[in-house]
């Protein structure tokens, strides 16, 4: 992940990101929410938070939240997520990521939605934090979704907002067909 100076860093996982993205994933019936982070200290934080809701008192205290957090699985890297999907489905996933820029392999939400509903392979959609993923990482994806545009020229959504908007476009109700 880049910071605002285009230096490679590792951003911190937040409790809000874990909870809010898990709830959004559950709402849109995402099978797994892979929380990918290379640092051991972040793995420990992720496992402590998810463990509380998956196995601890949180499971009893708030079963709805627990149901959402059950979809979260920590993994150290993208290759592990691809391998896990292949293990679960027997198929190599189509890899799609997001960015605020256009790339040669940028696709529309309509095309990505068709892959989800009509394709014969599972789809792994990755979201980054900070100021985007490294160039080498971006080049490894099959596709990059077109940016989310609002009515202004400001285009730097927090990851929780981007996930909610994009999952609604990919897996939400097709309201425009009504």
Predicted features along the sequence, with ranges:
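Conserved acidic residues
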Residues: 31, 93, 122-123, 142
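General structural signal for secondary-structure boundaries
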Residues: 2, 77-80, 107-111, 134, ...
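RNA substrate-binding interface of SAM-dependent RNA methyltransferases
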Residues: 1-99, 164-171, 175
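Secondary-structure boundary/capping motif
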Residues: 42-45, 104-105, 133, 154-155
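Long, charge-patterned amphipathic alpha-helical coiled-coil/hairpin "stalk" segments used as oligomerization
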Residues: 96-137, 147
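Short, glycine/charged-enriched secondary-structure capping and boundary segments
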Residues: 48-50, 109-113, 139-142, 160
